[in-house]
Curated annotation (Swiss-Prot):
Principal localisation: secreted
Domain CTCK intervals: 255-329
SUPFAM superfamilies given in the database record: FnI-like domain (SSF57603), Growth factor receptor domain (SSF57184), TSP-1 type 1 repeat (SSF82895)
Native organism: Mus musculus
Name this polypeptide is given: CCN family member 2
Domain TSP type-1, residue spans: 197-242
InterPro entries (UniProt xref): CCN, Cys_knot_C, Glyco_hormone_CN, Growth_fac_rcpt_cys_sf, IGFBP-like, IGFBP_CNN, Insulin_GF-bd_Cys-rich_CS, TSP1_CCN
Annotated ranges, domain IGFBP N-terminal: 26-97
Signal peptide: 1-25
Subunit structure, as described in the record: Monomer. Interacts with TSKU.
Annotated ranges, domain VWFC: 100-166
Amino acid sequence: MLASVAGPISLALVLLALCTRPAMGQDCSAQCQCAAEAAPHCPAGVSLVLDGCGCCRVCAKQLGELCTERDPCDPHKGLFCDFGSPANRKIGVCTAKDGAPCVFGGSVYRSGESFQSSCKYQCTCLDGAVGCVPLCSMDVRLPSPDCPFPRRVKLPGKCCEEWVCDEPKDRTAVGPALAAYRLEDTFGPDPTMMRANCLVQTTEWSACSKTCGMGISTRVTNDNTFCRLEKQSRLCMVRPCEADLEENIKKGKKCIRTPKIAKPVKFELSGCTSVKTYRAKFCGVCTDGRCCTPHRTTTLPVEFKCPDGEIMKKNMMFIKTCACHYNCPGDNDIFESLYYRKMYGDMA
């Protein structure tokens, strides 16, 4: 009797398990099939991450957006996919982990929440700190024979400035005078080199976007196959944030230009760690109001290994010498990352 009853009961339990598994588990059973084209272009401030199944790169979902196993929330903003009750585990909502709120411009934002401080900046609150990225293009237009006087202007009804080509004041018998057509100082490719009817031009690297910790430095060049202007970027670290450099200033001195680092370091980027250790140079500090910034640098590739095993290679600035000066960004500059001080002598 028991045996005859156990059969139907066991079958019912198996069927119940099969029916509830898609709702309770993670839907990663499908074969990895990613789009043939390059990785998607994410909006400003949105991370490009691997989907929850480790298959394809996707734009991370933001606070309050719907999420699934294949459409994860932005981990760099402390977000996770809250699936709610155990009975519904297919679709969730991106929720912020516990973190301190931010007060910005008289408004309070939750940790993980993104907002526009103005039409020019997209900001994110993360555990009490606000980080912003520009929404307007930061491109640089170099002078050229067809546009020797480029200038950025604010146009009516538009938020971002745009490039316009001013007519030269003086004209010669053979056309506009090119007296203002000067090449910027460059390091690397020869700026006077003509290659396939292309005048190669490269600007200097901009200052690092962070005064301490990992930041970004950029430059513009047309040194490519199509002779088109493109922006290049590299990682940079002027000094570690946790280092107390003032204690290394010698008695009677007001600055320490390039402090000695006791041991090799590993760089970190968005949870990923450099494969190798580096005995890098960093810039020091002053006690008389001056700031120390990189003066001569070089660019080298650095490999980073992420927790999921992915290896990514990024170009990074390595400091050769530093200079201490009074040309410093303002202490109340909220968007200090937009401050640029040119660096010289880069060999890459």
